[in-house]
């Protein structure tokens, strides 16, 4: 299994939790792969599935390209590249997906919050809708997903136009349909002990009679 990190929004890597989702997903896929590698009993080579794991974090609603170049690691060393913005990011994501029919796309948090005006003015609904079009699987919420409170975070997941902040929701799309990918939060619990959002997510891959189950912990 290959693990690929989209570099456009890796940012400052603010803590170990940012990479926890991708690391656990990688481990889960490897363990799942071990289940398919058992001997067949008749001497045949065991079948397997190649899975590409694509991860990113700290998008922070950066829908537009920045006004400066970013330092990225090129084949010959660091170079300055005029990259960024959702259009470039979505194109890079599509290219990675095209390389593997079996893939999972995960975000390790801070997809929204601390966002530029183009997203924050509309309660980050534009960012959720843009990421919906990219068809990712899960986002493990970070601290900035809670910038407007947990009720507003649930609205971003489930949709709707109920007002939880001083700004009016649904000013672009009415009704706002919410994220079409799962938000995960294993370490955020309600007073009754239930997690605010699902703690885990599962994606299954099937090819040639072989099924691999990949688990994600938010």
Where are these regions (language model features)?
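Bacterial N-terminal signal peptides
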Residues: 22-31
């Amino acid at each position: 299994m290959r693990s690929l990190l989209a570099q456009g929004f890796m940012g400052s890597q603010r803590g170990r939790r940012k990479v926890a989702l991708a690391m656990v997903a990688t481990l889960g896929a490897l363990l799942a792969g071990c289940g398919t590698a058992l001997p067949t009993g008749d001497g045949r080579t065991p079948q397997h599935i190649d899975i590409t794991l694509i991860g990113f974090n700290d998008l922070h609603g950066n829908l537009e390209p920045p006004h400066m170049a970013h330092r990225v690691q090129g084949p010959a060393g660091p170079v300055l590249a005029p990259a960024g913005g959702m259009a470039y990011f979505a194109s890079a994501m599509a290219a990675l997906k095209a390389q593997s029919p079996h893939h999972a796309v995960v975000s390790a948090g801070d997809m929204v919050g601390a966002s530029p005006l183009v997203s924050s003015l509309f309660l980050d609904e534009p960012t959720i809708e843009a990421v919906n079009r990219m068809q990712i699987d899960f986002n493990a919420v970070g601290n900035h997903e809670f910038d407007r409170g947990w009720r507003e975070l649930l609205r971003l997941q489930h949709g709707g136009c109920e007002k939880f902040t001083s700004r009016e929701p649904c000013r672009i799309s009415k009704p706002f349909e919410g994220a079409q990918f799962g938000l995960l939060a294993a370490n955020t619990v309600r007073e009754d002990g239930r997690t605010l959002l699902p703690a885990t997510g599962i994606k299954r891959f099937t090819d040639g009679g072989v099924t691999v189950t990949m688990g994600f912990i938010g």
